[in-house]
Regions:
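PRPP-associated nucleotide enzymes
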Residues: 1-169
């Protein structure tokens, strides 16, 4: 069992189906057994699954996360066009949306930020001070790429705005 099909496929398994709302699946020595805990359960979605949490190669409810993110970038351009020189993704999860934005707008995509791969998620730090420090340690601009350029920064989401505020300074 896995929350994303990609985890199963990486291990050479085959995705069979999703567990239904209110369903309990038990696998034991006698096989797989499915029980409905509640028959009136309604499926609920967390939008952050497609926007942020899921891997790009994951498919959730028949929607590929990469394609969802890329399409959101195209929609961003249509809804909020701007006159800039470069589209710069916030690594790593901002890339698919930035690609879509660049494709739809015709504005070149450029890697303008380098991510420190050893820094974890910044929005879950307990204090604002810790979040600010973590963002400064996590992302560094490529000055020779962004200097004197008008850029649009594309990130996957804004939870507290800490990353955005620090990057635009």
């Amino acid at each position: 069992f896995a929350s994303e099909n990609a985890a199963i496929e990486i291990l050479g398994g085959t995705f069979t189906r999703d567990v239904a709302p209110g369903e309990i699946v038990v696998v034991d020595s006698e096989g797989e057994h499915s029980y409905m805990f509640e028959h009136q359960s309604k499926k609920s979605h967390c939008i952050f699954e497609h926007i942020y949490f899921a891997r790009n190669d994951a498919t959730l409810d028949d929607i590929n996360s990469y394609m969802f993110r890329r399409r959101s970038g195209k929609i961003m351009w249509r809804e909020s066009p701007c006159d800039v020189d470069l589209v710069v993704p916030v690594p790593d999860s901002g890339y698919p949306s930035a690609i879509g934005y660049s494709q739809e707008s015709g504005i070149p995509l450029a890697e303008g930020l380098v991510k420190n791969r050893y820094m974890g998620r910044t929005f879950i730090k307990p204090t604002q001070e810790e979040r600010e420090i973590a963002v400064k340690l996590k992302l560094n601009p490529l000055s020779h790429v962004v200097k004197d350029k008008r850029i649009v920064l594309i990130d996957d989401s804004i939870v507290r705005g800490t990353t955005s505020r620090n990057l635009i300074q």
